[in-house]
Amino acid sequence: MIGRSRPGRNNVLTNRRTIIAGSLATTAATVFPRGAWAKEELKLHSFVPPTHIIWARVLTPWSQEVAKLSKGELTVRLFPSMQLGGKPPELYRQTQQGITDATFTLPGYTSADFPMMALTELPGTATSADDGTKKLWANFDKYLARDYKGTKVLMLWNSDTASIMSKSKPVRRLEDFKGMKIRTPSAAQSSQLEALGAIPIDMPVTQIYNSLDRGVIDASMIPMSAALDFKLIEVAKYFTVDAPLGRSPFLVAMNLNRYQKLPANLKKVIDDTTGLKLSLKGAAEYDAQSQAGIEAAKKDRELITLSAQERQRWMEAFKPMIRRKMEEGEKAGLPARGLVDAYGLLG
């Protein structure tokens, strides 16, 4: 249950607070010179490296804009690569529980906390990251906001569609999935792989390179935008790039209590610089990076595209799973049918 401590969790969080406090004293992960302290400072934590496109091209410029518009009264200090401690699946709860001020992460890392968001990962929800991001915000207040208790969503955007990247066995037809161990980023996308006959393996993106290289997994389900950021073209040989698979949503969320305690003028700076507009910048970066990944893979890797008939076979294989997910949500008291209908997933 969101926000409820499990046995032994208090000690873990206490230790983590100690680790983070030490990290804050020693880490110089900020876009501002040491000594240029503002009246308010927000610490944003993530698993991505500082070279990641969203970190470098969206969040860093945003933090600079916040400092400029607030005239130095508010700064956002960026901590990449899990510098404040913990593991990637813990990022959202770190922020939700006030251990950090904000985070950039995936809802899919803790799918049980985001039952409505999980439905947006199903196949057929969008035609591009831009399209998917607009749909996320169009459905946010009515369907998705309930997943974000204790936080304020600053950014929410879609990735490009997932691809299948494999080292030794290409995926050209539905039958090729049988028995393949494929990395998945979330429970929602695990269900897609099971529907196709594969064996899903939960794994954060930071473990894909070594796992694929050593044969721990046969393939990874991941967008082409990640191929360059995480150097996956070095280890994968086959890329099925136009499969009708789902898309991972990403988010930047802030602790709600921390936001509410900001002065009104600084809340306005946050409000004016985030939301759909900033989210669409993230989507644009993913769409552009996806094409860059495809172009890079073309040089000495095999790109696989599916016929319209084969794509339809996959979509038919997904329908029972989509219907089951919708019914499970309804039984749990969630407006799952309304969201599935809003996306037109069952026709």
How would you describe each model-predicted region?
Residues M1-T14:
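Secretory targeting signals
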Residues L13-T14, T18-D130, Y143-G347:
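N-terminal secretory/targeting leader peptides
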